[in-house]
Amino acid sequence: MDGRSQALESDVKKTMGVRGLINSFVCRITRVSLILGMGMVVGVGMASVNFEEAEGSNGTKGAGGATSSREELMTKSIARDAAATVVIYNSNDPEAKGLADFYCEARHVDPSQEIPLATPLSEEISRADFQSQIEEPLQREFVRRGYWKFSITPLDPDRRPALVATRIGFVALIRGLPLKIAPCAIPVGGTITQPSPYGSCNAASVDSEISLLGLFHHPLNGVIPNPYSVSPVLEPGSAKGGNPSVKKTKGGNSPAASTSFPTSGNRRKSIPPGLLCVARLDATTTDGVRAMVLDGLRVEREGLWGFGYIDLRSIKTGPYGLGDQSIRIAGESMRRAGIPVLSDDLPETIHAGFPVTDAAAYYGWYSGSIDGPFAEPSFRFLPGAVACHLHSFSASTLGDPAQGWTGPLVRHGAAASIGNVYEPYIGFTTNFGIFAWSLLAGHNLAESYYAAQPVLSWMTILVGDPLYRPYLGLLGWERDSHTSPGVSATRSQKWGKNPHDPWRDYRRIVLAHRGSTLEAASDLSHRARETHESLYLEGLGAAQSDAGQLTKAEASFNAAASLTKDPDTAFRILLERARTLEKEGKPARGAALLSKEISLARSDIQRALLDSWLTRMSKL
């Protein structure tokens, strides 16, 4: 045992004196959802929460012991998440303490749960500095504050204390902390037990290593299976499980290799108490961090209403098929929740000039740095939007507004994003399908990310408020946003002071048909004619096109084109009409349509996009 381990064990044993023994008998540790057994069970459109009562809880019980209302249950759940959150900041960053205080006030986290660390201001840190300036100080502080409960394991001949319970489950890292741990040489005499290109890699994101603070002495090389994950761990290039580069940890279970869509019942029954759900409150500016938090709070009250966009590459098989599959499932999950989804299935990323309007969610891939419409200076996501782009180095830096994807997406208004600080290999990346599904089920960002992340001690980070629940407003908890002073200015301009809101109406119609946009076709078409709103038909046409119902999609897009008065929407629907004809095997008709309606392209970038499409179709 090294000196650091001996010192920490000594501190642990001190806390296991009289106070620790008393706590082991009388304390009822607050449990946070899923990680520590709260057992949230949520369905689209409704939610129920079952959790262990914490000491001192004053929840109202009705006859038979049921909690009086679903809203009260969710309120308790949110409060317990806050009680189980620690906020970590860099004391060497002059703005970090202010951001930590701001976050604690906004999310009702007790300021006593802030933890300062003195770390370098650089994004990259050495493994030695991580251990001495982040890992060890946090472990000591968690022990000192009584966040962790230890017990001596009788079967351990060395009688070392083992972590058996915790009262924290979420960690918010404040802007200014290091982002990634640089690779280091294998020590003299050390061995590599995982023979693979990545089995010898000991680089990682700071966030991923912090999530494992309570799993002492874990191997540094390769990956560690995430016991919280419901996603498969697959060998890159293979559809089979049993990855030889998965680190073996005492008592750990290898995740099942399954591509089946997860349900709440698939959540792992036994989660190590030392596992933490970590998210990073980070942006290119401090104002960006504040906006991220405030936008999320407003969206939780009013709902996240807008289009979902997915950018596919039409790859069906092989390792890259996993990426397309996860994005496709994200889109289908949003559709089943009554959210209109627009998709791009061309091999390239969404082209510059393609109108991405009312963007509430985006999942796509694959280019090295932000491009297309997202890179345009005027582009903005809707407040509270979730935006994720799959690329090996999407989060190699968060400080450059034009490099990678994660930082730039946040700069353009997204409240949540996921990225990779170094090469993760596709089988170990976050499953966007599971992430989106979990968010739509009412879970917060941190829970959803860790459900979708197959491995830890690896390269991925979550940027956003860990407690943010983007779709809380879609689950029946929203307040009346039609008269709320915080209602979107854009929506107010479009539909007036007390408007008919087509986003809510669209969702209501789809959910009335069990979440099937295709089955709702007749009602959506009828509502479009009644309201003269193209949204119903554009969302329907996109679903029909993705389902291979191309003739029906063509009719829906044509009808949508006749209704819209918005120039950007008209140009986008033109492209969707032409692409549908191309997919039908009628590229000449698609090209003719683009030529006929060329006046809908209002800018040089849109005209350039039209020219590139005409060139492509003329070659088919």
Each language-model region and where it sits:
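C-terminal soluble interaction/assembly domains
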Residues: 383-447
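Structural motif corresponding to the intra-repeat A-B loop/turn of tetratricopeptide repeats
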Residues: 514-515, 547, 584
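Caspase-like cysteine protease fold
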Residues: 441-514
